[in-house]
Amino acid sequence: MANTLYDRTIAFAGICQAVALVQQVARNGHCDQDAFETSMNAILNTNPANTIGVFGREADLKLGLECLVKGIDSTPSGSEITRYIISLMALERKLTARTDAMSQLGDRIQMAKRQTEHFELLEDQMISNLASIYLDVVSPIGPRIQVTGTPSVLQQTANQHKVRALLLSGIRSAVLWRQVGGKRRHLIFGRKKMVEQAQILLARM
């Protein structure tokens, strides 16, 4: 896959979309369904033709691109988004250093792909299956990502499954970010360029 500013922006928007949806689910118990479907599809799309192919079309990443442009700021909400992104990227670094875990993750995702022959992607059972991949393979590598929200919402099993499935999608995009040459310096020194690229993509939707 190409290592261009466009590719890095798309991959980073994928991370942003997953964490923006985590925030929505944790607070309200529901989220943007189209964006959620895109993020779930991204987990299973392991052999894309190009970077955008992981997600579908640019418009499918609208929420993530908007979050990239406006959602990462010093407000409490923005600080929470930033914390989730940093935590996911740290977890991805630990995960990719473990070939055993990466191999197990690949096997479990292939199994989940086969399960879509019997279940719709957004069915509770399928979301539960994706959540269990995160819980069994990714989470034990640590550090644990602390999700904050409305306690009564987060106590509901279906919402816990959605959050974990979304964190798995965030990991998928963090792996993609690294595959297209994304580095920490791009976040520190190159974020303005990614924001400008995201604004261009949003303007043509």
Curated annotation (Swiss-Prot):
Keyword terms: Cell inner membrane, Cell membrane, Cytoplasm, Membrane
Keyword check for Membrane: yes
Stored InterPro entries: HflD, HflD-like_sf
Topology term for the membrane: Peripheral membrane protein
Major location (coarse): cytoplasm
GO cellular component, one term: cytoplasm
Keyword Nucleotide-binding: no
Lineage: superkingdom: Bacteria
Subcellular location(s) of the protein: Cytoplasm; Cell inner membrane
Family the entry assigns: Belongs to the HflD family.
Protein name from the UniProt record: High frequency lysogenization protein HflD homolog
Organism: Vibrio parahaemolyticus serotype O3:K6 (strain RIMD 2210633)
Lineage of origin: Bacteria, Pseudomonadati, Pseudomonadota, Gammaproteobacteria, Vibrionales
